[in-house]
């Protein structure tokens, strides 16, 4: 099995196949996926990045997967996971209460705004951040951890040398083309999401909690989930920002198949461009076809 980085002009499907499949068949399959993703990207007018890991054999489908994209709210997975990691050595941590003040509220607070002048537990903040993309909840998690650099430090502890969180909500969503702040690559995020949800990065209880939060996400019905059969299980975290940046990262459980980890990042050249969740759904359908 070989591994290659894929730029815009190339997409490689890496797999261990039964001997009855010829190299010509593999080449044709790779070309088909490449052509479909290239056509999708061209029609969108934006920049698309995709990374999928098939955990049955660790084969990968990669498209522009080593270029940086603004993470936007997909970074909330790392912050929540960092708090879960802390809870491995403090069984009471997730019940710790955090004060919510009116001055804490930012641009999107569907859960936190209901608790102004009250408190939320760290567990409630994690659920709010991941399942409702509550930005105040994310900021409270970041503050608890000690700042954006501590979220980055947690990523480094997992072996992720690419992820970087520099700011809090909502400024981390500026997604300025070429700005390295608050970015990662599709491949790096896919590998880390796999480690967090299916690997050993978290203890079993904490890993199960993260998966539960992701499966309960309420914001992803038009993104990766829209490209999946209804019978498949999906846990995901969406994100959006300026320049029409539209993201979704997911763990997928196809019927009768090992899980897939899929990252889809998309951005556009105009600052006020509209989100394009349909592009993510289409990309997901392309790369999961045949499972």
Curated annotation (Swiss-Prot):
Gene3D superfamilies: DD-peptidase/beta-lactamase superfamily (3.40.710.10). GO terms for biological process: beta-lactam antibiotic catabolic process; response to antibiotic. Keywords: Antibiotic resistance, Hydrolase, Plasmid, Signal. One of its GO terms (molecular function) is beta-lactamase activity. Its EC number is 3.5.2.6. It catalyses: a beta-lactam + H2O = a substituted beta-amino acid. Substrate binds at residues 237-239. Disulfide bonds: none annotated. The active site is at residue 73. Residues 1-28 form the signal peptide. It holds the Pfam family Beta-lactamase2. It comes from the Bacteria. The class A beta-lactamase family has a specific amino-acid numbering system, sometimes called Ambler or ABL numbering and often misspelt as Amber. A multiple sequence alignment was used to derive a consensus sequence and then the consensus was numbered taking into account insertions and deletions. This allows use of identical numbers, e.g. for active site residues, despite differences in protein length. UniProt always uses natural numbering of residues, hence there appear to be differences in numbering between this entry and some papers. Belongs to the class-A beta-lactamase family. Has cefotaxime-hydrolyzing activity. This is Beta-lactamase CTX-M-4. It comes from Salmonella typhimurium. The gene is bla.
């Amino acid at each position: 099995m070989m591994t290659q980085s894929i730029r815009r002009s190339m997409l490689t499907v890496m797999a261990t196949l039964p001997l009855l499949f010829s190299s010509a068949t593999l080449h044709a399959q790779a070309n088909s996926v490449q052509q479909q993703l290239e056509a999708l990207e061209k029609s969108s007018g934006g920049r698309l990045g995709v990374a999928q890991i098939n955990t049955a054999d660790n084969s990968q489908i990669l498209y522009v997967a080593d270029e940086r994209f603004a993470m936007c709210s997909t970074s909330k997975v790392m912050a929540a996971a960092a708090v879960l990691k802390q809870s491995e050595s403090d069984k009471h941590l997730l019940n710790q209460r955090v004060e919510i003040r009116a001055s804490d509220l930012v641009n999107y607070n569907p859960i936190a705004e209901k608790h102004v002048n009250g408190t939320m537990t760290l567990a409630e903040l994690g659920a709010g951040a991941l399942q409702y993309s509550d930005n105040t909840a994310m900021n409270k998690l970041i503050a608890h951890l000690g700042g954006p650099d501590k979220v980055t430090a947690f990523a480094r502890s997992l072996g992720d040398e690419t992820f970087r969180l520099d700011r809090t909500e909502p400024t981390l969503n500026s997604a300025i083309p070429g700005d390295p702040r608050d970015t990662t690559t599709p491949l790096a995020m896919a590998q880390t999401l796999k480690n967090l949800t299916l690997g050993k990065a978290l203890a079993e209880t904490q890993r199960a909690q993260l998966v539960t939060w992701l499966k309960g996400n309420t914001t992803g019905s038009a993104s990766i989930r829209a490209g999946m059969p209804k019978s498949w299980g999906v846990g995901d975290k969406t994100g959006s920002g300026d320049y029409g940046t539209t993201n979704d990262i997911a763990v997928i459980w196809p019927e009768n198949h090992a899980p897939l980890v899929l990252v889809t990042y998309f951005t556009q050249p105009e600052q006020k461009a509209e989100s394009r969740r349909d592009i993510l759904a289409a990309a997901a359908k392309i790369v999961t076809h045949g499972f």
